[in-house]
Amino acid sequence: MMQRNSNNTSITSNISNNSSSHQACASCKHQRKKCNNECILSPYFPARKTKEFQAVHKVFGVSNVQKMVRTVREEDRTKLSDSLTWEALWRQKDPVLGSYGEYRRICEELKLYKSLVHNQPLIGWDNNQRVFNNNSNNKNGLAMTNSSGSGGFSVNNNGVGVNREIVNGGYASRNVQGGWENLKHDQRQQCYAVINNGFKQHYLPL
């Protein structure tokens, strides 16, 4: 009799330990049902993601989310849950446009950055590899100066003629109509275009 009671006690303790070790996910908490290892939404909406699940449930519904998770491959289910969460949260922020509004905003930013790339003047460099900007009045051409006085070149409005003269570099080179020629010295140097978009600078190799 005592042995039977001890066995029942051990079984009860094992059951309680298993139930306490598996915390109910956000989906099962919302539905107020017991969560077990077979819950399909448990790995993707744990208890700490209650806010995210509430948004997903409001937009898509629990049964629809379960169907979508079952229809995709297991390795893609995390991406699916992240996508549903992102769409649902943006639907809460913008009930009219939802995630499409964020997509439009990103497209407008991309157009702005591309226009800055095409319209920003070329940036010069000196022998100390310091990048600087010279805002000239040339409409179609470029202008590059050298702050240290060791050399520089400029381009006319047509973007064709080059006037380059090096004072301290050991030689002088001048080419008016030949285009981009004789612009290499004994040591290789790189020229970068710097795009200032108001937040940070991007250095683009020419």
UniProtKB/Swiss-Prot annotation:
<dbReference type="Pfam" id="PF03195">
    <property type="entry name" value="LOB"/>
</dbReference>
<protein>
    <recommendedName>
        <fullName>LOB domain-containing protein 2</fullName>
    </recommendedName>
</protein>
<dbReference type="InterPro" id="IPR004883">
    <property type="entry name" value="LOB"/>
</dbReference>
<comment type="similarity">
    <text>Belongs to the LOB domain-containing protein family.</text>
</comment>
<feature type="region of interest" description="Disordered">
    <location>
        <begin position="1"/>
        <end position="20"/>
    </location>
</feature>
<feature type="domain" description="LOB">
    <location>
        <begin position="23"/>
        <end position="123"/>
    </location>
</feature>
